[in-house]
């Protein structure tokens, strides 16, 4: 159930957490109250500045413990898009001069990635890099056998998202990491050009466990607004600081990100992460997901859950459900739901409103199915009543459509 900043319940249902998680205003207001008393530049060399700096470093260490990595390899940035660009900027700077001298280098990815990855790779392609797209299965997951075939001595980076932002389906990042590590140790032994492994973890962070060491990752990127934090804030993890800063200036964040960090956003993110872990928010979301699927089965709606048939519970995010509505087009569904105070989306919200239907569903199935598929994003703030309301509304739309045939 949607609430305002004061905690008052609004007669609206927000089911679009994959676009952005509703802000945790309770925590945000608590942190604002604390910072009002000690507001200062965390890089200032006085007591107030050092106090803020201490709070920021506490969050850095907290996140490092959560994802099992060296805290000195975590850098605060404006979010996933900036973090992704920083990874590719490093690769460009490391290899572009060698490409100019006639060498050839590959970057392996999939066509299911977020637009900030795909667009960046197109730019690298223009600069002479070979962009190799690995095959995907019927769920949109990376085909492990095809990945093995495409690794070569020319490969410098593999970039695969942890979970798809439009379907919630997860890639086997641990397995991919093991394959890359094996290749590095056997085929590239002694070479300075080891294959680096990057994963866009924007949808997964705070929902599923990420273990950097176990997954053998060199980079991950995270956006705090996807878990209830503030916009324009997140992290990049870069093993051994394998980065080149995009912004130059005061050498903040160990010289990797110049500019004064957003203390409010960082401290809020730390508190929200604590809340997620301590209150086991994921278990609540799982119950809501099960309830959604039960209510769909009990309803008169003709539907299918995209990319979900046969998957185990640990192979997809409970927070994201892509649903194919056989008799309802996405435009009608979203318009009528919106008019009834129920908010969902069709696909990614990261393309400035240019695309209504899911391009991922179109790639996996076809355009017609994509035009009849909605994305429901569940958050810890949702209720069983929210699920009842959207099912009730979709049933009414279904009845109108079938009765008019």
Residues of each region from the PLM?
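Pyridoxal 5′-phosphate
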Residues: 1-405
């Amino acid at each position: 159930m949607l609430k305002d900043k004061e905690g008052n319940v609004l007669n609206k249902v927000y089911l679009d957490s994959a676009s952005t998680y509703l802000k945790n205003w309770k925590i945000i207001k608590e942190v604002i109250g604390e910072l009002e008393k000690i507001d200062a530049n965390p890089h200032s060399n006085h007591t107030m500045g050092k106090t803020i700096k201490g709070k920021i470093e506490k969050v850095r260490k907290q996140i490092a413990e959560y994802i099992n990595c060296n805290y000195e390899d975590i850098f605060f940035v404006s979010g996933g898009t900036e973090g992704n660009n920083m990874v590719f900027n490093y690769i460009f700077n490391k290899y572009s001069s060698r490409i100019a001298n006639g060498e050839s280098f590959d970057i392996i990815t999939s066509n299911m990635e977020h637009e900030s990855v795909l667009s960046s790779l197109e730019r690298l392609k223009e600069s002479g890099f070979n962009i190799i797209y690995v095959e995907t299965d019927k769920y949109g997951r990376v085909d492990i056998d095809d990945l093995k075939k495409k690794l070569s001595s020319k490969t410098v980076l593999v970039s695969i998202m942890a979970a798809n932002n439009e379907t919630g389906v997860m890639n086997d990042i641990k397995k991919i990491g093991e394959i890359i590590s094996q290749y590095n140790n056997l085929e590239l032994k002694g070479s300075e050009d080891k294959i680096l492994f990057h994963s866009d973890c924007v949808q997964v962070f705070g929902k599923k466990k990420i273990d950097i060491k176990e997954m053998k990752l060199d980079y991950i990127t995270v956006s705090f607004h996807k878990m209830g934090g503030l916009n324009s804030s997140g992290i990049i993890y870069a093993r051994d600081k394998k980065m080149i800063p995009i912004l130059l200036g005061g050498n903040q964040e160990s010289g990797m990100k110049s500019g004064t960090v957003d203390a409010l956003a960082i401290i809020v993110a730390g508190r929200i992460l604590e809340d997620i872990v301590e209150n086991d928010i994921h278990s609540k979301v799982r119950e809501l997901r099960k309830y959604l699927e039960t209510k769909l089965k009990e309803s008169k709606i003709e539907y299918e859950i995209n990319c979900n048939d046969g998957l185990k519970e640990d192979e997809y995010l409970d927070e994201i459900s892509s649903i194919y509505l056989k008799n309802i087009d996405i435009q009608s569904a979203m318009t009528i739901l919106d008019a009834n105070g129920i908010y969902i989306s069709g696909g990614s919200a990261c393309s400035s409103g240019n695309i209504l239907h899911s391009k991922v569903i179109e790639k996996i199935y076809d355009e017609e199915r994509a035009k009849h598929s909605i994305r429901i994003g569940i958050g810890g703030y949702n209720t069983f009543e929210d699920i009842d309301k959207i099912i009730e509304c979709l049933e009414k739309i279904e009845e109108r459509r079938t009765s008019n045939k």
